[in-house]
From Swiss-Prot:
Pfam families: HSP33 (PF01430). It comes from Pseudomonas aeruginosa (strain UCBPP-PA14). Keywords: Chaperone, Cytoplasm, Disulfide bond, Redox-active center, Zinc. This is 33 kDa chaperonin. Its main location: cytoplasm. GO terms for cellular component: cytoplasm.
Length: 297
């Protein structure tokens, strides 16, 4: 079965709950193609890609959403980004010798910390931090929303190295249902039904089939899907700006240490940018050695 990478929003007409579903295949494959990840790492990275895409779909902003997990375990870093125009990228760092074939999130990232950052082009940056607790990433994110002053939100995530899928339910401010007990009963009803969805079903079924399987007795409005794509924002210009920010003296020292050229590798896509002495001289031509430029990078 062929699936296009997409996020798709839906609403329940009789209650104040919205949902989002995400399906990643090609973009997930492109992320994995950049690095030879062990299967458990690839699965967790896929779940994070799906989670970031789901969260981005719930926000109205122009900018970047970043999910980053750090730990002292076999996977010290997981990082994914999803932009407001639905471009995704991600990476993981790991120690292969200490990863079991069936390792879960807690085995891979013990004592971990998850950071959620929303970085708008205009406006104030938001950052939330939570311990990486729970059986899996979906539980960790659900607990974060439950413990913070956010709209109640639940996640269901799964990935298998080929396809990454996610389902999100979020309770909206009171509109259709004003009574607190009725709102809570409706929320519990919808999330309990979603809890019956198996990982195999989430990975194998399309959005309409999943929603019919769970909510055939509810009135659900499904919106047009929005495409998601892999895209890395690295460029030679950004790499050059990074060198300028170091200052001319440090760049000249690096040229000496690296035998005449400076290499900058993108950790997300493995693209390599080389700068020789002539390139570096051109970067600082007319600028003296005043240090960082005002160019944002």
């Amino acid at each position: 079965m062929s699936h296009s990478d997409q996020s798709q929003r839906f609403l329940f007409d009789d209650t104040d709950v919205r949902g989002e579903m995400v399906d990643l295949e090609r973009s997930y494959s492109e992320v994995l193609a950049k690095h030879p990840y062990p299967e458990p790492v690839a699965q967790l990275l896929g779940e994070m890609l799906a989670a970031a895409s789901l969260l981005c779909g719930t926000l109205k902003f122009d900018g970047l959403l970043v999910l980053q997990a750090r730990s002292s375990g076999a996977v010290p870093l997981l990082m994914v980004e999803c932009s407001s125009d639905r471009q995704v990228r991600g990476l993981a760092r790991y120690s292969a010798e200490s990863i079991g074939a069936d390792a879960g999130m807690q085995e891979l990232m013990p004592e971990g910390v998850l950071t959620l950052t929303v970085d708008p082009v205009k406006g104030q940056r938001y950052q939330g931090i939570v311990a990486l607790e729970g059986v899996n990433l979906a539980e960790c994110l659900s607990n974060y929303f439950a413990s913070s002053e956010q709209l109640p939100t639940r996640f269901w995530l799964n990935a298998n190295g080929r396809r990454a899928r996610g389902l999100l339910l979020q309770q909206l401010p009171a509109d259709r249902l004003k009574d607190p007990e009725a709102r809570e009963a409706s929320w519990q009803h919808l999330t309990t039904l979603a809890d019956t969805l198996t990982a195999e079903e989430l990975l194998a079924l399309d959005n309409e089939t999943v929603l019919h399987r769970l909510y055939h007795e509810e009135t659900v409005r499904l919106f047009e899907p929005q495409p998601l794509v892999f895209h890395c924002s690295c460029s030679r210009e950004r790499s050059a700006n990074a060198l300028v920010s170091l200052g001319q003296a440090d760049c000249e020292r690096l040229l000496e240490e690296e035998e005449g050229s400076i290499t900058i590798d993108c950790q997300f896509c493995n693209q390599r940018y080389l700068f020789d002495a002539s390139d570096v001289a051109q970067l600082f031509a007319g600028a003296g050695s005043q240090g960082p430029s005002e160019t944002r990078h």
